[in-house]
Amino acid sequence: MPGVVGLITKLPRHRAEPELLRMVEALRHESFYVTGMWIDESLGLYLGWVARKNSFSDGMPLRNEQRDVVLVFSGEEFPEAGTIRHLKQRGHELNVVGPSYLVHLYEEDPSFPAGLNGRFQGLAADRARETVTLFNDRFGMHRIYYHESRESFYFAAEAKAILAVRPELRRADPQGLGEFVACGCVMENRTLFEGIKVLPPASAWVFQHGALMRKGTYFDPHEWENQIPLEPESYYQELRKVFSQNLTRYFDGQERLGMSLTGGLDSRMIMAWLKPSPRSLPCYTFGDGGGRRQCRDVVVAQQVASACEQIHEVIPVGEEFLSRFSHYAERTVYLSDGCVDLTHSPDLYLNERARQIAPVRMTGNYGSEVLRRSVAFKPGMPVAGLFSPDFLPHIHAAGQTYAGLLQGHPVSFAVFRQAPWHHYGLLALEETQLSLRSPYLDNDLVRTVFRAPKSALGDDVCLRLIADGDAVLRQIRTDRGLNGSRRSLSAVAHRGVLEFFFKAEYAYDSGMPQWAARIDYLLSPFHPERLFLGWHKFHHFRVWYRDTLSGYVREMLLDPRTLSRPYLERRQLEAMVEGHLKGNRNYTAEIHKVLTLELIHRLFLDSK
């Protein structure tokens, strides 16, 4: 995703500046990106940045009135009301809109960036103090990769920028690779690459004279964990107050904003309290372009948009995406630095189209994880015989690491571990195309949720919040039939049917057991997939890999380069590919993983 990039070094300028140029170019992915550089030899700072044109972060660098502080900021910040007015009263010169106030917050607030609210990364160069401070948000969602060498400290929003100037780092880290196979992400601020790490959440690392002096942290999760729990009613009232008061911050700004609606609760809570004027907020939903049926997300989202008097459209995944799958597969892995597998390749396609509607996408992301403590990832063991015995210990170790992470506070797991490790990859991919917003990582909201009693962790709080904001929206069933206001027999039966198809679709697609795959193969002339697919999901990779994408799967996975990877067992991989393409076996998850690993090799590890 767009962000800061560069090096802090004692190297002479004629050596450091060419490296900076290559690092910036490594992040220039789109024609709507803008780039810049700022160099201060006295500080040993060679700084670059990439931003989407007209986004909050466009227009860097920021300077104070004395021009002895330079700040470069990437991401978005959602300040308290009155912040800019207060700074003007203090005598600062700044624009009413945009990020110019941030450099003055740095001057005024000794704890900067502790007071910032949002997902961000940045760097402050202070000539008066002769310091450089590299910082990120308290959740670590706007990731900064780094590498420490003997002569330089490299940092970048994407790992590929560091690989561009330090090719010796194009080596897979076995522990990171094992975690990616087992959990779908790399944990504990490691990466897939040896020698490249991730800046921990809430970092403020200070450099002087080209050298790292202090690895500072401006926030400790215990500050929120050690709060006194609230009683159920007090918690609800506080949650309602914070959510309703802070929500409008996330709709500020000069760019056009689109609402990404789903059939669930979290985007509906936003609509219930935003109360947009008629036809003022473009709404859209990602849907299945296969022509079978409108998925439940689309059906429910259309009802919500209609109730709010907003225009709604469907962005489908269909033949256009499938015809260019190899392009989107490669770009998904490349743009995310291998942090997501090919399950999310449709998301790149969809967000390209969403940008055409609006360059800012409002979502309900992270609502279920924060408010209802949903666990979005866990370790899983691969099919026996696919990976070599030498590599299996790294996969097993991932499960032990994960188990240790669950020992702390469940909200801390959700926002300080699950969010920056598991959710980061999709966020990074989507933000290559547009600015993604969600009110569910708001500082005040998350702080409040840490005080939730155990009785307030289900759907009831969210349903009540919707009803208090807009009683009409409460009446609309969710994509899975949930509606807290109606307990009739017909409502229960309706929800049961939707739950059946929700689970049946998973079982008929990527989750199909091997015995069922053999039956499906015998019934294939009758196309039983038409009965089950398209109810809840807009992608159907088991069938796609078997049919439309079979040539791509065969070409990639039976290629001698793939079969020769030392951690793979060749014969088992060949048997899996042939079984899946024939149709009497289901290895969707394994094909996802091995295809992604192979693309990581070809794009990052084999490339020099």
Predicted segments, located by residue:
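Cysteine-centered catalytic environments shared across enzyme families
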Residues: 1-320, 328-329, 595, 601-603
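Adenosyl-5′-phosphate
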Residues: 1-7, 41, 164, 195-196, ...
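Conserved glycosyltransferase catalytic-site signature
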Residues: 98-102, 117-120, 174, 298, ...
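Glycine- and acidic
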Residues: 224-233, 257, 283-288, 331-336, ...
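Glycine-rich phosphate-binding loop signature in dinucleotide/nucleotide-binding domains
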Residues: 252-254, 354-358
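Short glycine-rich phosphate-binding loop at a beta-alpha junction
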Residues: 257-259, 360-363
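Catalytic metal-binding/acid-base residues of hydrolase active sites
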Residues: 266, 366-367
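ATP-dependent adenylate-handling ligase core
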Residues: 287-350, 368-386, 403, 410, ...
